Amino acid sequence: MTPMSENNGSENTRDVSAAMMKSRSNSSEYAGGDGSFHASEVESQSSQGASGGNTSASKRRTKASRACDQCRKRKIRCDYDDDKGVCTSCRKNGESCAFERIQLKRGPSKGAVRGHSVSRSISGENNNTAATAVGSGGEFSSPSSRQGSVLLPPLGQYLPQPAPVPSNLNATQQQQFWKVPYHDFQGQRRGSIDSLSSDMSAKSVNIPQEHLLYASPSAGHPPLHSPVTFGPNNSSTDSGYWPFRNSGGEESDELRRKSGSNPPSLKNVSQPPPPPLQQQQQQQYSYSKFNNSFAQYGANGFPSRHGSIASEGMSPSASVPYQSVPMNQSNSNGLSQQQQQPIQWPKVQPKNLPPPQVQVQAADKEETLGNSFQKTIKKRRTVSASSGENKAEPGEYPLARFSSSGNDSLLGGNLVSPAGFVYGQIPEIQLIDIYYEFIHMVFPIIPLNKETVTNEILLVNTQPISPIHEINNYVILWFRNSLELLIRITLKRRSGHFYDSLTHSKERELSNEIRGNSNGGGSNDSKDDNLEMQGVFVTALNECLQKIVDIHPSFRENKDKISPKVKIIYLSTFVLLNYILAVVGYDNSFVLGMSTTIFKDFKVYELLLYDDEDDDATKSGSNDNDNTNNDNNSNNANNDNNDSRFYDENNAMNWDQAGYSITFKRLYVLLIIFDSLQCCSYGGPKLLNVPIEGASERFFQTKPHSNSKWVVDQSPTRMKFILQSVKFGELLAECSMKRRSICDLSRTQLTWEIPPYFLKGVTDEDDELFSLAQLLAAFILIRKEFVDCLLNLQDLETGELPTVDMELCGELIKLLCQLTSIILQALTVMMRTNPKNHIDYNYRPMKPMEHDDSGNSASRKFTTSQAESGKNSGNDFYHKLLGLQDNAEACLTNLLRGSISPYCISMLREIRNVMELVKKMPASLIGVVMACAGTHHNTANNNNNDPLAITFQSQELVVKLSNCMNDMMQITSLLNMIKPVNLSDQDSDNTSATATITTTETISKSLNRDHSIMRRLYYSKAAKRDKKHIYPSSSSSPQLQETITTLKSFVLIGWKLLDDFELGWS
C-alpha cells in the first residue's frame, strides 16, 4: 500500500470517527440520563481513529487511568482491568473494585456542561444558559449506559449550595386539609415547572428500570449527597412521606390491604411528566393510614414542607426502599431547628456485575468529600436487587437489619438518633400489625381496637398551616419511635444478644458479622459490652421520654385547640414507655413520675372519679357509626353528615366526646396499674392512690349494643384475655394500697381481707385456668392466704405457739400444695405461650374461631393443623419431660402463644423469692406430721380410739408433701428454662435466686436468725404498748423442742414473705 493510500485511510478513519461523535452526541442511546456523555470516551475513540492506520504506533493503556477506592486508601498501585473487573489487591482481599470517591475538581466536566445543556433544551430554554445553570446545581449529569464506563456520582450535588428563597404558590394549589400525618421541610428549595420536567425527563431517559430521586438543599437541612436508587424489581408502587417501606409489588399490595387506601405514586418515571395542573390534581391523595405520616424529619424540631410540586419529587421524604443509613440528628434549642449528617445511597450496577454494595457511612460532609486518610475499615454488605432475594420468608415480617446476607433486604432508612439508637428499621404499618398481634390482647397499651386506631385516631391533620399541626407531627413521630423501641427490644434475634443493632456502629457491625459467621450464631458478650448496650437502651428510653415531655408546654398552652386524637396518642406514649420498663424489668421511677405529672395536668383523674356516665359512653352514636361504615363507599351523596364529621374535628369531638372520655379513663387505669406493679416490684409508696376496683368491667368490658368504634377489641376471646390482664392489675393496685407498713401504722392489724370481687374472678370463671394473668392473680391470692396462716401460728402480743395437731398440719400442707401447684401451672403457661417473652414471627398467636350463639362467647374447638402446630413448637424432649404436651384442642393457651406480657419478669422474681423461702418446708412438715402421728397414736391407744385412721391420715399428708416436692423439682427446671428478655440478665442465672431477697443476708443464714424488718416493726410497737413479747419455752409447751423450732422457722418464713411483699420483689 502506498503512503498516499495510507494517508487517505487515516483521513477516512478520522471522518468516520467524527461522524460517529456527531451522531452519538445527538442520540439518546449514547446519552446519559440527561443527554450527556463522557468526554473521556470521545477522546479515546478519536485517538483510536487517528492512529488506526499505524498499528505499531498505537499503544493501549495497560493500567487503570484511575485507582479504585480500596487501592487509593492503601496507597498502592492499582492494576484494574475492564476485562477482569477487579484489581489484584482487591481480588486477594476478597473485595470488589469501587470507584465511588468523588474527585476534587475545580469545575464541572465537559460532560456535565453538555448534559446540562441538553436537559435545558428539553425544558424549552436556551442552550447558552447551560454554563450558568451548572453552578446552581439544578441538574446533574448521569453516567453513560455503556457497560465498560465507570459509574461516578455527579459532582454538582456535592458542591456547597445556598438555599434559594422559596417561591410562593397560589393558595388554591395547596390541599386545604390533610388527614394524612406527614412532615414538611422548612426552607425547601422550590424548582420551577420547567426544571421539574427536565428532572423527570432526565430520570426517564435510558434508565427504564431505575428511579433517581435527588435531594435538594434547604435552609437548616444539609442536602442529601447521592441519588436515591431503586432496584429494577422494586418500583415505587405507592408513595407517601414515610421512607421506611417495603418496595416489592406484592408487599406493597399487602400493605395497601392492611392500611386501607394508600396514596398513589408521586410520579411515574416511565411516562412523560403530566402538565402542572394534572400534577397538582395528583397531589390530592386519598386519606391514608398510619404509614403515610411524616417521613424523615428532625427529631428536634418542626420543619415544614412547602406545597411545591418540585419539592415533593426532590425532598428527602420521598419513598426510599433501599435507604441505607439515616441522617444523624443532634440536639437543638428550638423546635424548628435540625442538624443532619449526609448519607450515602446505594447504586444500581449492571446485571452482569455483583449485587450493589451498600457502604454504611456516618461521616460528615468533609469526610465524604475528601478525607481519604480514614484508618477504620468500613463494612460493606450486600443487598440483593432481585425480587426473589428481597422476598421475606412466609409468615414473617422482614426486619431491616445490618447483615451481609443477600436474603436480608434493607427496607428503608435508619434514623440514627442523638442517643445512638437506630430508628426506622421496621415499617410503620408493620409496627401497628405487630402490636395488635403480639401485645394488645395481653395488655392494651392503646385501649382501642385496631380499626379505630388506624382509621380514626392516627388520621391527624399535620398540614403545616399552624403550630398546632406541627405539634401533631411531633407527637406522632415520638409515638412511632417509642413503639419501635418496644418492638425492637422484644423482637427475637437470629443470633447474638437482644441488644444487637440497637446502635449504629460500623466496628461493632463488622465484629458481630465475623463472630456470627465463625460461630454460626450468637456468642456471649462480655460484661463491659452488656453494660455499654444497657446504657444505650437507657439513653434511648430517656430520649423518648425527654422528647415527648419537651412538647408538653406547647401542649398545655394549646390544650383547647388540640384534637382529642392527638391527646390519646400523647398519653398512650407515656403508657408505652412504662410498658417498656415493665417488659425489660428496669427500675426507672423518673418515667413513672413524669407520666403521673402529665396525666395530672390533663385532669384525667377527674373523669375517673367524678364521671359516672360509663354506661352511655360507648353507646352514643352506635347506629350512626354502623350506617356510615356500611354506606361510606356506596352512598357518598347521602352521607353529608359523615363527610362533615370526617373533616370537621369540632363536630367529631362533640359527637364522640363520650368515646374519648372513656378512652382517657382507660389510659389512666393502665397508668395506675404500672404504678402498682412498680410499687410491688421495687417497693416504695404509690404515686397514684386512686382506687380502680371494678375498672375492667366499667371501662374495658364490651357491653351489649355498644358502639363498636370504642371497644378495646372486636374479638370476644381476645377481650376475655384483656379483661383478665386488667383485673390482675386491679389486684396489684389493691395489694399495694393495703400494705401493712403504710396502712397499719398502729401495728395491731397484721392481716387484711381480700374483697370478694377479686375472689369471684378466680373461683367462678372456669374449671381450668388458662390465662397467665388469671393464674398470677390466683398465685397472689393463695400466697397472701399462706402468709396469713404462717403469721397466725404465733400470737403477735404474747408470742405463744398453738398446739400442733393433724388439723393444723393439714391446713398448712393444703396451702403449701396449692401454692406450688399454682406456681407450676403459671410457669407451664409461660413455657407454652412464650418462654422468652419476645416476639417470634414463627410462633404467632392462634386466631380464635368465634361464633354468635351467645354474643360474647368463643369457640374452643380448634382445627387439627392448629393443634399440631401448637404441639410441635419448642423442644419436644423437654415438653414431654415436663408434661407440657397436653391436648391442644382443650387448652386455650394456644391463643396466647407468642404474646408478651409486662408482668413476666416481676412475677418470675417473686416466684423465685417464694420458692427460695419455702423449698425446705415439705421436708420439715413431713417430720412434723410423723411426730404428730406418733403422739396421736399413743393418745388413741390410751383412749381406745382407732389408730389406723390417724395412720391413714398421716400417710395421705405425706403423699401430698411428696407430690409437692415433685412440683418443686419441676418448678426449678422451668425456672431454669424460662429466660425472658431482661435488662440485667441476672434473673436467668441459677445463682441469682437469692439476689432478689430483701434482706442483706442469704436465706440459709437469715432463717437461723431472728431477722425480719416487719417483725421488728410490729414487736417494737407491741413493746411500746407495754406488752412484752415472750418466747415460749420447751417446758411450758406440750410439743417437743424440735417441733417448736420448726414452727418458729415457719413463722419466720411468714415474716420474710411479708417483707418481700412490703419492700418489693426485686
Swiss-Prot record:
Biased composition (Polar residues): 1-11, 42-57, 118-131, 139-148, 260-270, 314-327, 855-871
Gene Ontology CC: cytoplasm; nucleus
Gene Ontology MF terms in the entry: DNA binding; DNA-binding transcription factor activity, RNA polymerase II-specific; zinc ion binding
Protein task: Glucose-responsive transcription factor that regulates expression of several glucose transporter (HXT) genes in response to glucose. In the absence of glucose, it functions as a transcriptional repressor, whereas high concentrations of glucose cause it to function as a transcriptional activator. In cells growing on low levels of glucose, has a neutral role, neither repressing nor activating transcription.
Name of the protein this chain belongs to: Glucose transport transcription regulator RGT1
Keyword field: Activator, Cytoplasm, DNA-binding, Metal-binding, Nucleus, Repressor, Transcription, Transcription regulation, Zinc
DNA-binding region: 68-97
Pfam family, one: Zn_clus
Listed Low complexity bias regions: 328-350, 622-641
Residue ranges of the region described as Disordered: 1-70, 108-153, 214-285, 298-399, 616-645, 849-871
Highest rank taxon of the organism: Eukaryota
SMART domains given in the database record: GAL4 (SM00066)
Keyword Metal-binding carried by entry: yes
